[in-house]
Amino acid sequence: MADKEATVYVIDLGESMADCHNGRNESDLEFGMRYIWDKITTTVAASRKTWNVGVVGLNTDETNNNENREEYQGYENISVLQELGPMTMASLRALKSKIEPSSTSSADAISAIVVALRMIQTFTKKLKYKRKIIVVTNGESPIDDDQSEEVANMLNDVGIELIVLGVDFDDAEYGFKEEDKPRHKEQNEKILKTLVDHCESGAFGTMAQAVEELATPRIKSVRPFKAYDGPLTLGDPQKYPSALSIQVERYFKTKRATPPSASNVANPNGPPQTQVWNEDDGVPFSGVGLQPVKQLRTYRIEDSKAAGGKKDVDMEDLAKAYQYGRTVVPFGKSEEDYLKYETTKSFTIIGFVPMSSYEPFLNMGETGLIVAQKVNEEAELGLSALIHALHELESYAVARYVNKDKAPPQILLLKPNPAIEDDIECLYDIPLPFAEDVRSYQFPPLDKVLTITGNVLTEHRLLPNNDLQQAMSDYVDAMDLTEYGQDDDGHPAEYAPIDDLYNPVIHHMNQAIRNRAVNPDAPLPPVAEILTRFTHPPEPLLAKAKTEIDGLIQAAEVKKVPPKVQGKRGRKDTVKPLSGLDIDALLSETRPRTKKTPIISTENAIPEFKQILETAEDDETIEIAAKQMGNIICKLVSDSFADVLYPRAAENLRVMREELINMEVPTLYNKYITKLKESLLSGNLNGDRREMWFRWIVGGRLGLITQDESEVSEVSENEAKAFLK
């Protein structure tokens, strides 16, 4: 069952809360509300029906609370701004309009706590709830401490946690002390501190620390989710009585975190409607003037007799189909059911591997935790024996796992818990790849060069010499982060520990959503420093390692890359010499320039084609290069046995298309692709080559270059679509 929470925020809206103190450019109320809004918007984002929020205003101009005392004696200027209940965007915006400084500062903070206490008592009764009261004040209004001990006892009896956060309150642990503090404020701080100390569950602190900690991402804690409950077997217990069978339970140990997903909404002209929801779905998405967008998909076929030339087709009349070459092969539901791999729920050990032979890069996903079935001593004994055996033999188990009937099987690696000496006996499981998921690539060796003749070279311009290796070793040692950080006692510790590394995409997205919920017209906040502090090497360490960096640059003979300047055609970038001299002009003075016709080879067509266009100085050179590339594509198609060379021809065509778009000469490509289509469909390229057109050119979107892709093109989008039919 989901956790139930009841939290009441007591917010000081007194006249003094409108003032700015200690060099801040925001009022005490705005400063304190940064914490309140963050907490409330987190509750709204969770969309949990069982998380209830109430708000009590302290030092309000009016008095409106639930105390049935004559003229609210002792509870003046205390108002309930929001009754306890689920928090929605509508109630959030309604609450925001009520948070304004008042013109009074005479209400008693302890009386406001009593109002919040009775709100929680009335709402939660004696049910199981997490009860909490959070007080935000600057301590300027008078406080009567005559009944503080009695109030603390009431809080303890109900089981309420009291948190008091004061604006500019002294906090020795945080290291803050307000200078020239008014005497009455100092006395009020002591009263509130004493009240918190008398509570069995409470906290007292300064608002500066609370606001500072808002930037630290809060890791979501979740309840253990049982993914499997059944036998873990070794062998087939139904066939062999000696087979091993242990009743186990499997839970998720780690789960991939994802950023919140967005949905399409609309601002309708009619009255807003509330989306239907149930108890498990959370609060309704309503009250903000937006409605979710519903998608409607229809299927149509051409029919000259129907209105508009098209007729709607029912879903019952449709069948899935797969493309096989240029042929569409339909598959009915019966064929799909026949092709499904039938599985039954099972968890079976299929083998064992030594720990030393397992490579960590084979880990494929989220980790699971396997423990013995609860209240089953036989299962506990059996699993314990298996875990100890794996430890002693330094082995891992490999298991086939199907969490439910007809689910796809997984291969899991079962690792015994390394902390077995702490009486924590469990197995960790990690998904393994199947054979077709593993790609083996051959790379040239890093310590030698193999020549074409078979010679082995240990000294080569592509291999590091001893000086370079030593310089790199010194640089790595100088940039060592293992002891660059500090622990709480100031001793050397690891820099950027894993517990301090947060995903900036996920947490900044959450922070931005919370900010936009409260301030829809304000700009988005910058990325919190805690999310980016480890994205770059620390500057002091870089300065300290400058000598090693300079030595590495010298040993590696690192040279500055010449800047690129705009070429003569205004389309491509050309390299400008560091000297600034015109090399072509200097060479033309010593020897006459002869124009060479560029030649592109079939074996190295793409790099040579790009190189020619990179240095092209006139349209004639570009036309020659495009013509040669086109001839190579036609030759590949013509020489292809079946479709063997089609992928290579399509890749050449794709590069040709992209480069001619960049060179702003789409006409060359459009003329060529028109002729190529005619040749492919007419059989002029050594047989039936229509598959090259339909699968690789039409399917690869390598048709005419349109005006959207190149401003100088004269082909419209409709013409390009018609060309591909």
Curated annotation (Swiss-Prot):
Transmembrane regions listed in the UniProt entry: none
The enzyme's E.C. designation: 3.6.4.12
CDD domains the record matches: KU80, vWA_ku
Keywords: ATP-binding, Chromosome, DNA damage, DNA recombination, DNA repair, DNA-binding, Helicase, Hydrolase, Nucleotide-binding, Nucleus, Telomere
GO molecular function, one term: ATP binding
Ku domain mapped to chain residues: 232-478
A biological process from GO: DNA recombination
Entry's Gene Ontology cellular component terms: chromosome, telomeric region; Ku70:Ku80 complex
InterPro entries given in the database record: Ku70/Ku80_beta-barrel_dom (IPR006164), Ku80 (IPR024193), Ku_C_sf (IPR036494), Ku_N (IPR005161), Ku_PK_bind (IPR014893), SPOC-like_C_dom_sf (IPR016194), VWF_A (IPR002035), vWFA_dom_sf (IPR036465)
Family, per entry: Belongs to the ku80 family.
Entries under PANTHER family matching the protein: KU AUTOANTIGEN DNA HELICASE (PTHR12604), X-RAY REPAIR CROSS-COMPLEMENTING PROTEIN 5 (PTHR12604:SF4)
Name of the molecule in the record: ATP-dependent DNA helicase II subunit 2
